[in-house]
Amino acid sequence: MAESRGIPVPGRLPGSTGRVMMAPPNRARTIVVALGGNALQPPEGRGDIAEQFAHTRASLDPLVALAREGWRIAIVHGNGPQIGDDMRRNEAARGELPPLPVGVLVAGTAGWIGYMIQQSLQNALDRFGVKRDVVTVITQVVVDPDDPATREPVKPIGRTMDEATARLLEAEGVPVRETRAGWRRLIASPRPIRVVEHAQIRRLVEAGTIVIAAGGGGSPVYIDPRLGIEGLDAVIDKDRAAQVLGGDIDASEFVILTNVDGVFRDFGTPDQALLGDLTVAEARALLDEGALGAGSMAPKVEAAVAFVEAGGAAAHIGRLEDGLDVVEGRTGTTIRA
């Protein structure tokens, strides 16, 4: 039974819901979507599961729109607030239960956040009659154990806190730093090299399945010559992990959906200006000049530039609710070679 969205793929994957798997008509159109934390919960929210489910359901229209347009999709999500909460649970249970290492906490958040996105997106696709399955893959991401970043806590995670709370944590040996939004704890964040499960993810995506992978950047691992794959106590930036995944699965496009309209020169100042189209050279010049301002935009632009330099057609950065318009260049920032 052929439909206008694509051609049924023979057979059924293990665990399939029974839907006919649909291959999008243009096999070159593969996109990796990096979802910011605002897709899961509002910044000032309570953070309980009911609120996160409600916010996730309300945030998925852009992904449904991409699916309806026939894009092959891999989704990478952040987990900053959630991993911070889990680290606080470790501290609260000190003396009662053995603490879980950070790589295990990342895998745990990837599981339950993936479940939340998977269920919510599958329901939304079904409502629109889009015959695509959604699955979550717990993902390991290879890093270099000798990367200096494995020993230098620089990445903010968890919820913001007041200075008094931050100073108490600092006195206990927890690295903290003041950010624009407030005080945050810090953790080591090495650069990703490759996704261990990339071949499995690629096969699923090529079959038309929407894959949620590298959740929270994926669990960092390294290759021990004697033991094989071993975990590392750190986190990976989700935008950089998404960029690496895009190269591993040969995606043509990469989009980072966040809570700002795109890349601004002099962001946060009276002279800020939205930059709609950039070449890789122009984007690199902005990074070198420090013209993107303080905050989290520079790592996003670095990831976008790396994706295009590795052979991707284009990388986009824009507001979550404008998803399809960002990908099609009507709003946000697009970076090309």
Where does each model-flagged region fall?
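N-terminal amphipathic/basic-hydrophobic helices that include classical n-h-c signal peptides
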Residues: 1-21
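C-terminal catalytic "cap/lid" subdomain
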Residues: 18-337
